[in-house]
Amino acid sequence: MTRADARENRARILEVAREALAEDGTTSMNQIAQRAGVGPGTLYRNFPTREALALAVYRLEIDQLTGSVPGLLAALPPREALRRWTTDLVSAMRRKHGLGDALSPAGHQSATDQSYGPVITAITRLLDAGKHDGTIRPDADPRDFLQLTGALWRAATGPEDRSQPMLTLILDGLSTHPGKAR
């Protein structure tokens, strides 16, 4: 197998695991290998445990999320970029919560510890852009923002999902002109 094939297998395993574990946190490693079209040996060579696989899925998600900030800021006004990014953050946190069956308490803590710095850096960039254009209050703190958004991913999903109205309240609280640029 070439290195390119190995990279493709790893990427396919991660994508399948991301979907499978989000659907059902109890999905077995063998089921993931089957869905990814790889043998169990390939799966276990890349990810020796379910927890290692779940942590890799989460790391990939955080990398994609934090890596999206420059593109959002290039395409959108800062407040709208912050809204879109935060909506994606909420989805990622809900999926992380869905990994509960695959992660031990130590695994959850490891995921949180590894993601905190990059997430705070991303929030800082988004808030700083809004501060620079005058739409975000100068005293907005990325750590406070992250704490506030914790309630969003815990909000009910489905028809009772209140995360978007709650996000509007948070953004209005950060705004130099509440109620504008929704």
Please tell me what each predicted stretch does.
Residues G37-F47:
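Short hydrophobic/aromatic patch on the recognition helix
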Residues E51-L53, G98:
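A secondary-structure capping/hinge motif
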Residues M29, G98-S104, T135-A140, G179-R182:
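Short, hydrophobic secondary-structure boundary micro-motifs
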Residues M1-R35, A52:
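Basic, helix-initiating cap at the start of DNA-binding domains
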Residues G117, T121, R125-I136, A151, ...:
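C-terminal peripheral helix-coil segments that are non-catalytic and often amphipathic
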Residues F47, A54-E61:
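Alpha-helical DNA-contacting segments of helix-turn-helix folds
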Residues E61, W85-L89, S115, V119, ...:
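Hydrophobic/aromatic residues within well-ordered alpha-helical segments
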Residues A56, G67-R94, H108-A111:
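Hydrophobic alpha-helical connector segments
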